[in-house]
Amino acid sequence: MLLSKNDILKARDFKMREVEVPQWGGSVMIKTLSSKDKGAFEQKTTADKLDLSTIMAEYCALIICDEDGKQLFTREDVEQLAEKSAAALELVFNEGRDLNTFTEKDLEALAGN
């Protein structure tokens, strides 16, 4: 069956996954990124002046969501999120990387900017 434009635009094509974060005493929901968000994140990570102190928090802010897939954190929350446990953020980051199919090659390309 060929899909129409309307079929494609109405498709619920985002995946979500619950991730247990022991450091925070519970779990969070994460989601796949939109093409727009993934592109913006990749562009940010290849910028000349990459801020490594907040990059994990920025990614986590993009993927942590409520049960309906609505993003919980805004850009304004990134600094506060960056103050949280590195182990907790790394756990969420790695789960998000897996869910969003960032390969090792993708990560090397991003890091190689």
Give, region by region, the residue ranges found by the protein language model.
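Extended acidic low-complexity intrinsically disordered regions
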Residues: 1-15
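Short, surface-exposed, charged amphipathic helix/loop patches that serve as local interaction elements
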Residues: 23-113
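Short acidic-hydrophobic surface loop/beta-edge motif
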Residues: 15-23
